[in-house]
């Protein structure tokens, strides 16, 4: 049985949950490819890790940008429910789902449980290049 080292208990829980659903994290290779064994379709998936925005107390979330096996660029975030919910697109805010989700969050909070939200958005190449240039300039 593989033992994982994680930066946080949340990350370890997510990796273990993914494994229970048939997706086993294999590691990150020397070319920054995240390797995921898809036990459902019996294939090894490679997600190119493009950027990581680490968690901090100001952002209250962590984000990664990856290129998936089909070439799509995907922004993935995990963080506090309030932070993720306020950043949802207008399309995602419509309907009963958001209200029902908030009901569950409130119920879990009453039970003393903490919630963690996951969100993703596909971004086009041009938007990514623009964002990445700004991010790299900010590091200097």
Question: Where are each of the predicted segments found?
Answer:
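Cytosolic catalytic regions of ATP/NTP-dependent phosphoryl-transfer enzymes
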Residues: 1-140
């Amino acid at each position: 049985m593989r033992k994982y080292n994680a930066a946080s208990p949340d990350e370890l829980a997510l990796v273990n949950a993914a494994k229970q659903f048939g997706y086993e994290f294999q590691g990150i290779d020397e070319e920054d490819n995240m390797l995921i064994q898809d036990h459902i379709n019996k294939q090894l998936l490679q997600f190119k890790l493009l950027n990581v925005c680490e968690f901090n107390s100001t952002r209250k979330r962590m984000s990664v940008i990856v290129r998936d096996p089909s070439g799509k660029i995907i922004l993935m975030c995990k963080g506090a429910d309030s932070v993720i919910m306020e950043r949802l697109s207008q399309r995602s805010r419509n309907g009963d789902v958001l209200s029902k989700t908030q009901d569950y969050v409130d119920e879990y909070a009453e039970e003393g449980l903490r919630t963690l939200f996951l969100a993703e958005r596909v971004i086009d190449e041009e938007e990514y290049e623009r964002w990445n240039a700004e991010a790299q300039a900010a590091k200097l």
